[in-house]
């Protein structure tokens, strides 16, 4: 399957590293124009833009904190100025926060995770849908997680935000469908990125993690990117309102492989 997205205008939030960077590259390789959103490390965003341009693609880098609705409004107006609209939004920006049991969690830290992961996704989806609904086309794809459904001790804000992303995806999909717009999500499992280097670089922790994954390996960012590119293309034109999990079987309760 050779997915093509020529002429499509895409925004990927949190795109200067990890899964976001892989998605941006995947969209560009498929022919889309890509706006790379970042908060910090502008040099990484600029490097990604240059990588895309060297492949004869089109990309721009735009700094914005998605947890700030005013900044999100400015972000979308910059895309309007560059490309006169948007066809694809990838809500990828997210943080997991410091580990702490619920009753020991700092309230401000808890709130920050919700503001970035949930409010940020909503603010961006809201701006995108304002543009997609009148043109009667477009796709919003939210990056969720296996922790949309799997509890994760010490990360109550993160799991709450991802569970909420699942229902936000369904509700916005229901609202937008009559206008020709799809809304869906992808739920990565354990993906080998810098954010979890402390796990995959530690043999003991890695062994424990792999025991939870039936395919017995971590995923690569490019594996998420390939799924995302397909889902936002016309090859998935009948898919909306669902989270597609890309997790090596992590959600299939591997402990029951041999009878529990």
Feature-to-residue mapping (PLM):
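Residue(s) in the substrate-gating loop at a strand-loop-helix junction
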Residues: 145
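Alpha-helical segment proximal to the catalytic Tyr-Lys
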Residues: 130, 174-175, 237
């Amino acid at each position: 399957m050779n997915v093509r997205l020529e002429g499509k205008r895409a925004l990927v939030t949190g795109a200067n590293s990890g899964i976001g960077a892989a998605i941006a590259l995947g969209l560009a390789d498929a022919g889309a124009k890509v706006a790379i959103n970042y908060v910090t490390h502008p040099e990484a965003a600029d490097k990604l833009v240059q990588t895309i341009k060297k492949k004869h693609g089109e990309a721009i880098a735009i700094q914005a904190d998605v947890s700030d609705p005013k900044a999100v409004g400015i972000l979308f107006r910059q895309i309007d100025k560059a490309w006169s609209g948007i066809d694809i939004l990838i809500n990828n920006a997210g943080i997991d926060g410091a580990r702490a049991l619920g009753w020991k969690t700092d309230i401000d830290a808890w709130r920050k995770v919700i503001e970035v992961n949930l409010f940020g996704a909503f603010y961006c989806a809201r701006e995108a849908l304002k543009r997609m609904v009148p043109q009667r086309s477009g796709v919003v794809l939210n990056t969720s997680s296996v922790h949309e459904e799997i509890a994760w001790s010490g990360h109550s804000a993160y799991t709450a935000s991802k569970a909420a992303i699942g229902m936000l995806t369904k509700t916005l999909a229901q609202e937008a469908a009559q206008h020709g717009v799809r809304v869906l999500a992808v739920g990565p499992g354990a993906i080998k990125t810098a954010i979890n280097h402390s796990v995959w670089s530690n043999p003991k922790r890695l062994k424990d993690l792999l025991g939870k994954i039936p395919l017995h390996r971590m995923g690569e960012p490019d594996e998420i990117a390939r799924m995302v590119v397909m889902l936002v293309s016309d090859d998935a034109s009948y898919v909306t309102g669902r989270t597609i999990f890309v997790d090596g079987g992590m959600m299939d309760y591997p402990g029951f492989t041999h009878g529990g």
